[in-house]
């Protein structure tokens, strides 16, 4: 139970003070109530060891590898047809139910920031466990609990939910493309994901203008996974629905063909549930349910509350004549009947065949003496109304084998899109084929450089005449594309040498090209001189160059470096897919692509969270990168030092100097001038990103640590550690 209101009317006395006990620790008016616009640093301390019961020594990959996957899959398959009295299976098969669970686990993914998806098992927690679109999926997870209980730590909930969906498809006669484990559970709700600003379920303030959807959102309404199946805001207009479908699925990384395959394939199975009006019969969602419900929600008082009386979406009916078996009947029905608008018993808009056609062809889910006509939703008819979708749908109808392959591949992409590179995939069912959306990186096929080689290469890099700024900037630009959300980006693959990254404005393409050309010369010269198959990749050289820059700036420190990166090819790089990794802002380089409604400091925290940084790591990196002159276009904003290119704590010392007074120098209050408090002489200029480390109380507390007279050594040590972390975020081979 998450709605922890005490139902007891009588008030006891506090055993310590004797007063009435009204609230416990953590209750009361919070900082966020007083100052709702305060910077939210809590997203930088998610999923810490304090909330993880497994302990830091636990290795999920090792645990998964000890799993008997074949036996587990058999147990899941046996469950499919083992109908439980407390939640009877439609058509005697839980397969469609588990497909919906898996789909809704993975379907929250959005490509813009890589957040959402199945990767952490978030469907277990609010808000997802209580979204209107996830109604009754609490029962699906409860059905799986005996299996999770049996296999324990060897299988995460995140993996189990997706595997159950795969097993469901296979149990009903469909051949899947494969399955990979490797999704490690977290133990608390995600605070970093922006689901929208609406305060009411199914509201859609996320739209503006000509139905322009707010970034990074993908779903059309608060609490939905994709689109409204009845049509935009319940308007049963198939063509308007197609527009929503296209944008939503594209924002979830699906093209038109994949979209049609997923809709047609997914709706081949199961049915919708709307036996009666949910407003009259269905009670609170899990997060608001009473404590005795033990995590379950949506209690239904209509009839038996389950089986033929189930109320979920409010829509009612099945699409095909064999809802628990793979077939091509969905497309056959979609084009084989003409459809007219009707309403479900719950009052929801849906479609039935005209003139009573199709009557008696669809079995009842629970009563063998009943039968029905097929049902379509507005979102289904969009596949006929939209000319592009219709062409694809008819092609699939005429070419069943092509449809099956398209659905298998699209389902695999849907359920694995947020897992990152194949190096993270676990298990015997991992497909051998490497797919372009997995951002493939060649395997290491050469002997790696050793310490002596590294010393030689460092000397060559220094001899090339790069400035500290050029060396550090290039390495940062390469590595900082990483997103901990969907594990994309990073230095491995050296895609900074390829389109589109090499041309991004934030990377200063002219300067970048100069550095990369020189590094390629060093690479060719070194590799040609080797006689035993030893090679160095550009990816490794770029990171090593950053290490050289920091060592030059810090004088007496060795920056860790681990070779083993390889170089991707342009043909292994989907330009459109990688375009979403281009930073809208990078506060570490004091870069803003344009003016946004979101503040620069909020975008900094967002970027830091995607880089999996803590608040101390964020702070020390900002301080170090500023004095190393890594700013976009060599801007002097935030360069609070007279020793540019030296790794000092000057940024913090000078920011915290009360002898400086700050005033906005632009109407938008994004640039500030720091002047001598007594003379008015201009000393520094800074951005909101710079000044937030003196303004925000938490960040100021951290800045003070590094601004003390005895902190220089700690500052350098902490900076190098945080730097090394960023350089290796995508080195899954080292985990």
Swiss-Prot record:
It catalyses: H2O2 + AH2 = A + 2 H2O; 2 H2O2 = O2 + 2 H2O. Residues 17-28 have a biased composition (Low complexity). It comes from the Bacteria. There is a cross-link at residues 226-252 (Tryptophyl-tyrosyl-methioninium (Tyr-Met) (with W-103)). Residues 1-31, 352-371 are annotated as: Disordered. Binds 1 heme b (iron(II)-protoporphyrin IX) group per dimer. Its EC number is 1.11.1.21. Heme b binds at residue 267. This is Catalase-peroxidase. The lineage of its organism: Bacteria, Pseudomonadati, Bacteroidota, Flavobacteriia, Flavobacteriales.
């Amino acid at each position: 139970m998450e709605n922890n209101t005490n139902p007891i009317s009588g008030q006891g006395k506090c055993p310590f003070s004797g007063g009435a006990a009204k609230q416990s620790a953590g209750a009361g008016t919070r900082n966020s109530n007083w100052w709702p616009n305060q910077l939210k640093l809590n997203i930088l301390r998610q999923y810490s060891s304090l909330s993880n019961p497994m302990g830091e020594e636990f290795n999920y990959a090792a645990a998964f590898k000890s799993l008997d996957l074949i036996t587990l899959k058999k147990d899941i398959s046996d469950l499919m047809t083992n109908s439980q009295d407390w939640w009877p299976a439609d058509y005697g098969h839980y397969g469609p139910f588990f497909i919906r669970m898996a789909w809704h686990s993975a379907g929250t993914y959005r490509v813009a920031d890589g957040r959402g998806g199945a990767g952490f098992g978030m469907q277990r927690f609010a808000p997802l466990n209580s979204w209107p679109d996830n109604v009754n999926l609490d029962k699906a997870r409860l059905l799986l609990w005996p299996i999770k209980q049996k296999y324990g730590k060897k299988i995460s909930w995140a993996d189990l939910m997706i595997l159950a969906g795969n097993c469901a498809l296979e149990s009903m006669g469909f051949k899947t493309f494969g399955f990979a484990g490797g999704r490690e559970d977290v133990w608390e709700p995600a605070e970093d994901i922006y689901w929208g600003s609406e305060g009411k379920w199914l509201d859609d303030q996320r739209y503006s203008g000509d139905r322009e959807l707010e970034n990074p959102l993908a779903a059309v309404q608060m609490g939905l996974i994709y689109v409204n199946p009845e049509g935009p805001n319940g308007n049963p207009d198939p063509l308007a629905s197609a527009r929503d479908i296209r944008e939503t699925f594209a924002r979830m990384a699906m093209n038109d063909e994949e979209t049609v395959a997923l809709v047609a394939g997914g709706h081949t199975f199961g049915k919708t549930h709307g036996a009666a009006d949910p407003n009259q019969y269905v009670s609170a969602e899990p997060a608001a349910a009473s404590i005795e419900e033990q995590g379950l929600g949506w209690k239904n008082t209509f009839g038996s509350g389950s089986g033929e009386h189930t109320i979920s979406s409010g829509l009612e009916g099945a699409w095909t004549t064999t809802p628990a078996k793979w077939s091509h009947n969905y497309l056959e029905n979609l084009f084989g009947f003409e459809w007219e608008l009707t309403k479900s018993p719950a009052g929801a808009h849906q479609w039935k065949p005209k003139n009573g056609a199709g009557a008696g062809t669809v079995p009842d889910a629970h009563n063998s003496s009943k039968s029905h006509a097929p049902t379509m939703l507005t979102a289904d008819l969009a596949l006929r109304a939209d000319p592009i979708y219709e062409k694809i749908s008819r092609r699939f109808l005429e070419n069943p084998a092509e449809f099956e392959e398209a659905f298998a591949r699209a389902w695999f992409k849907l359920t694995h899109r947020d897992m990152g590179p194949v190096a993270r995939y676990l298990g015997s069912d991992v497909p051998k084929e490497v797919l372009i959306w997995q951002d493939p990186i060649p395997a290491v096929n050469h002997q790696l450089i050793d310490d002596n080689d590294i010393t030689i290469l460092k000397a060559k890099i220094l001899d090339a005449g790069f400035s500290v700024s050029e060396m550090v900037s290039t390495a940062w630009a390469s590595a900082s594309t990483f997103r901990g959300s969907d594990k994309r980006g990073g230095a491995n693959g050296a895609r900074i040498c390829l389109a589109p990254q090499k041309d991004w404005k934030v990377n200063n393409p002219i300067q970048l090209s100069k550095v990369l050309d020189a590094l390629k010369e060093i690479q060719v010269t070194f590799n040609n001189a080797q006689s035993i198959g030893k090679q160095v990749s550009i990816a490794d050289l770029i990171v090593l160059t950053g290490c050289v820059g920091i060592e030059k700036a810090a004088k007496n420190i060795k920056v860790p470096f681990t070779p083993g990166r390889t170089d991707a090819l342009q043909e292994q790089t989907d330009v459109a897919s990688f375009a979403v990794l281009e930073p809208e802002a990078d506060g570490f380089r004091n870069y803003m692509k344009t003016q946004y409604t979101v503040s620069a400091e909020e975008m900094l925290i967002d970027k830091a969270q995607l880089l999996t940084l803590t608040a101390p790591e964020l702070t020390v990196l900002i301080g170090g990168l500023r004095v190393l002159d890594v700013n976009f276009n060599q801007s002097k904003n935030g360069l609070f030092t007279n020793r540019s290119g030296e790794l000092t704590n000057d940024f913090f010392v000078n920011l915290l100097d009360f002898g400086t007074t700050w005033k906005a120098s632009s109407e938008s209050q994004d640039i500030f001038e720091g002047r001598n408090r007594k003379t008015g002489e201009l000393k520094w200029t800074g951005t909101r990103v710079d000044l937030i480390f003196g303004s925000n109380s938490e960040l100021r507390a951290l800045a003070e640590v590094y601004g003390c007279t005895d902190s220089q050594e700690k500052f350098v040590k902490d900076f190098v550690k945080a730097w090394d972390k960023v350089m290796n975020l995508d080195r899954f081979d080292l985990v």
